[in-house]
Amino acid sequence: MKLLHLDSSALGATSISRELSAAIVAQQRRLYPEVEVTYRDLDRDPIPHLTAQTLAQTDPAEAAAAEAVMQQFLQAEVIVIGAPMYNFAIPSTLKAWIDRIAVAGRTFHYTANGPEGLAGGKRLIIASARGGVYAEPSNDFQEPYLRQLFGFLGIDDITLVRAEGVAYSPQHRADALAAALAGLRAEQDAAVMA
């Protein structure tokens, strides 16, 4: 099994989404010892944002790099994304990666009945970290966007592991992380029992 692990937080070692995504990948390694993991840190190794030049693909090296990103995505059976909430949405580095994989004719196509995803059969696990608590859907453009986008690509097996309110206090941060990790352990136990 091939697993693609992406982190997008700019907070480095203090990042909750990075800690959660690492725990998810460790869980997958325990459940599936044969898993092959490809890791990309979108903060340390960002993908260029789309411009007229990148869309034209006139630079062979840039075109090859974009194709490598696409192949990593297409070959992965499981995708783990560390996705913190920045200003109600996702980091621009994650959006730049999404722009490279959401490509007509590759991961979706248009039909007489509307668009159809071509990237089904994958499992997506999102490690979501939020400084506040966003129970009101009108304030959350992160998780709905990720669900919509990956659903559009044909991925319907989506799991969210969320730690929220992490900016309220050190105790709230610790409690939110512990609750998210406990949820992961419960999921792992259920998978082992199945």
Curated annotation (Swiss-Prot):
It is an enzyme of class 1 (oxidoreductase). It comes from Xanthomonas oryzae pv. oryzae (strain KACC10331 / KXO85). This is FMN-dependent NADH:quinone oxidoreductase. It catalyses: 2 a quinone + NADH + H(+) = 2 a 1,4-benzosemiquinone + NAD(+); N,N-dimethyl-1,4-phenylenediamine + anthranilate + 2 NAD(+) = 2-(4-dimethylaminophenyl)diazenylbenzoate + 2 NADH + 2 H(+). Binds 1 FMN per subunit. It holds the Pfam family Flavodoxin_2. Belongs to the azoreductase type 1 family. Quinone reductase that provides resistance to thiol-specific stress caused by electrophilic quinones. The gene is azoR. Homodimer. Signal peptide: none annotated. FMN binds at residues 9, 15-17, 85-88.
